[in-house]
């Protein structure tokens, strides 16, 4: 089968078709309209294949967070993803994430060098034992200073989602999270720039005071 990019297991929410992904061929999937759900301006947009998305990311120097959502109907989807990432020489430009820790273990078995993220509500317990996870991805509201410190002290990273307002973006920057998942990329970039500029100003003021 061919890997494609879709958030849900069912096509209904975004295409109106009451069908599960594993019941259609990719040729049939390509005929669906996945754009009208968002806006008439996107009517006719197709569900993309993962290969197509990776190629677009490479051409535009964009890193990807590839989330694997396995089901009982998938046959070793982890190997298929790893093989495609390797084939397209994209391993250093992506992170593979999943809510299923077993999927991350399989990814690491196939390629220990690929970065992985465990998608979870909270990073609790002994996170050091989760060897197959290079980091954790969680809802931003669950991120706390102590949690960020525990994750960083374990040598792992923390990604937060989905952060779309300035106040929460700035709070995540102050928490020193490693990655902010957002629908408003330009706003996040602006906040990061402002934060760094403010740091420079603070350091300069401190320098002047110490003269």
Identify the meaning behind each predicted range.
Residues 50-54, 78-82, 101-105, 144-148, ...:
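Generic structural signal for well-ordered alpha-helices
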Residues 29, 53, 66, 100, ...:
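Conserved, mostly hydrophobic/aromatic
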Residues 40-44, 117-211:
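C-terminal active-site rim and adjoining tail of enzyme catalytic domains
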Residues 74-87, 102-116, 128-130:
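Distinct, well-ordered alpha-helical segments
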Residues 58-64, 90-94, 112-115, 132-134, ...:
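Short, well-ordered coil/turn segments that N-cap beta-strands
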Residues 67, 96-98, 162, 181-182:
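Active-site-adjacent beta-strand anchor residues
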Residues 1-58, 114-118, 132, 195-211:
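An active-site metal/cofactor-coordinating segment within enzyme catalytic domains
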Residues 38, 62-73, 134:
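Glycine-rich phosphate-binding "P-loop"
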């Amino acid at each position: 089968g061919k890997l494609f990019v879709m958030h849900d297991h069912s096509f209904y929410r975004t295409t109106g078709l009451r069908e599960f992904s594993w019941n259609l061929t990719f040729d049939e999937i390509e005929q669906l309209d996945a754009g009208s759900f968002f806006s008439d301006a996107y009517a006719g947009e197709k569900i993309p294949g993962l290969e197509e998305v990776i190629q677009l990311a490479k051409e535009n120097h964009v890193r990807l967070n590839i989330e694997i959502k396995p089901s009982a109907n998938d046959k070793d989807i982890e190997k298929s993803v790893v093989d495609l990432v390797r084939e397209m020489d994209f391993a250093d430009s992506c992170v593979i994430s999943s809510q299923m820790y077993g999927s991350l273990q399989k990814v690491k078995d196939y390629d220990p060098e690929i970065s992985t993220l465990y998608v979870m509500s909270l990073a609790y317990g002994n996170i050091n034992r989760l060897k197959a996870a290079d980091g954790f991805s969680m809802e931003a509201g669950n991120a706390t200073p102590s949690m960020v410190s525990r994750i960083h002290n374990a040598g792992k990273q923390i990604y937060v989602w989905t952060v779309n307002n300035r106040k929460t973006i700035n709070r995540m920057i102050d928490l020193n999270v490693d990655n902010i998942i957002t629908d408003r990329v330009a706003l996040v970039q602006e906040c990061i720039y402002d934060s760094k500029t403010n740091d420079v100003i603070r350091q300069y003021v401190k320098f002047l005071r110490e003269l």
